[in-house]
UniProtKB/Swiss-Prot annotation:
Protein name from the UniProt record: Xenotropic and polytropic retrovirus receptor 1 homolog
Keywords, alphabetical: Cell membrane, Membrane, Transmembrane, Transmembrane helix
Taxonomy, superkingdom: Eukaryota
Side of membrane Extracellular, spans: 258-269, 339-344, 397-401, 493-503
Record membrane topology: Multi-pass membrane protein
Domain free text: The SPX domain has high affinity for inositol polyphosphates, such as myo-inositol hexakisphosphate and 5-diphospho-myo-inositol pentakisphosphate (5-InsP7). Its affinity for inorganic phosphate is tow to three orders of magnitude lower.
Domain named EXS: residues: 435-639
Domain SPX: 1-177
Membrane-spanning segments: 237-257, 270-290, 318-338, 345-367, 376-396, 402-422, 470-492, 504-524
Any GO MF annotation of the entry: inositol hexakisphosphate binding
Amino acid sequence: MKFAEHLSAHITPEWRKQYIQYEAFKEMLYAAQDQAPSIEVTDEDTVKRYYAKFEEIFFQTCEKELAKINTFYSEKLAEAQRRSATLQNELQSSLDAQRESSAIPGLRQRRKAVFALTHEERVQHRNIKDLKLAFSEFYLSLILLQNYQNLNFTGFRKILKKHDKILETSRGADWRVAHVEVAPFYTCKKINQLISETETVVTNELESGDRQKAMKRLRVPPLGAAQPAPAWTTFRVGLYCGIFIVLNMAIIMAGSHYLLGKDVWPMVRIYRGGFLLIEFLFLLGINTYGWRQAGVNHVLIFELNPRNNLSHQHLFEIAGFLGILWCFSLFSCIFGLWINLQMHLNPLILYGLMLLFLVNPTKTFYYKSRFWLLKLLFRVFTAPFHKVGFADFWLADQLNSLAVILMDLEFMICFYSFELKWGDSDGLVNSANSVCNSYSYGVRAVVQCIPAWLRFIQCLRRYRDTKRAFPHLVNAGKYSTTFFMVTFAALYSTHKERNHSDAQVFFYLWIIFYLISSCYTLIWDLKMDWGLFDRNAGENTFLREEIVYPQKAYYYCAIIQDVILRFAWTIQISVTSLNLFTDAGDIISTVLAPLEVFRRFVWNFFRLENEHLNNCGEFRAVRDISVAPLNADDQTLLEQMMDQDDGVKNRVKSRIWKRSQSMSLRRPRLSSQSKMKDAKILIDDTDDEANT
């Protein structure tokens, strides 16, 4: 592998601009070689002066790169030393508290027998668990810094050796000895000492001297590296997807033959939510694949466990498996009379199995990922009582696009409670009324507002924590427009059913607030969530200064589809109002629901890209984990202090200036990455010029 590819494959994405600009140096050397005056048409002194002037510029550039690397390495090393001291103090405090609580073993055992663990013991246990996680993240940051050290030294050695070969001189090697080999980033071995100390502390203090267990906890692949799925997983993905496609075609043919002339809408509404969930999981798998390929570190952004998280193939497998269950359940509905199973039992069995898959307490079927999702859902639905993180409001945003699932769930509960004729074998296609699909009792309107309400209270909670009206209160205003839109839609629907004369008034109010909501959310999507239409976009017209994905066309197409799908509701209202054909509203809404999931799928790419660029600007490469976090008041006070004119603002300006000096970010395919041993990057030190 060429070193340029090796460097691109193994750098930490969030520190990309702090590495040696190896490709730029190569271009300098090749350009100098191509533009050099020929010895055949000019004298030797002119050629020597040309190369002498070039070398002066070349070595000045090397000095600037070396100074940049030394500065960044020193800052990160100092940060690591401070973090190490903090973790050591927290560990010592936890161990001291643990020893004090166990000083009277008899009393402690009696307490355990009667009251199980005391509150103090539970807190200590939780602190030790948090410390293990904090040390593993800290160890990862040390490995990344060691990797930074090794890659930059190898980069200088390679480029200076190439310099000597092209210019037929030894001044590059001399410069390396005089400058690089004595540079602080290379000579400083404190990083190795910190790594060794961390391994020792985790082994002796947290894993009771079991080094194998300690190293298993510490060793981790680099963030952003694709975790190869087993061959059987790949096989199952292909098998499930193939079966799902074939079954869907069979369902369409069977349904058009056996259900012709029947009222299939209750069955469609009941099964529609399951299909949208399967579509969402499959598209999320594509999101995950795209993020990995582009170098968007979603593992860090979602604060996932880098040792154990779902890859795109795992998501495809889950979506395919659930898709097959969904198809078999629908088949059983259609052919219920032939298999002696009442039609209305099939959805209950299907969604019961899906729920069981999610809450299964055994450590099987991606237990850690399912438990992470359940905790996240709990945090989303109890938003006012927790500090809101990125994963929390990201999931709530997904729920806003999956609101149809909640509405279909409400319909299913209502239908089974009031409309279903349990004695009929074909109850799902033999409904006498459609009360459950209306706003008659107001429950449907409340359910429709739940996702927007969750984001609304999240924004209020973030405002409480940060005291920043913009963007949090402004964002809350965006979600509040949904409440008005749904309210007037419900009023219009109920007044129209009862032939009230004021129905048209509510219709126009509904349209006005729908229009306001769509414009509000569209502007927020493009400007705030995606960071587009930046004044400093430069050559990236209408985009932003830095872009991750390789083609600008991706961004322009995403803007167009977002505009179209944000206003797709106008088609539904127009067709429904004009009554162009039977069941127009149901047909259009069934088509638009998966399109909204697709819009959110596209939104995810650019929302995480924007968050990734924020992490790059802050050089944040690992999770921030603290055993003793600041409370909300202290956090607010600290942020206010940092906002002073002589504080962090100057650093922000400096970061903006630095970002303006760089080109678009792009990470090559991760297939070129090599495996790590003990989570340490091994740099190929070969001197073979074919590999440079």
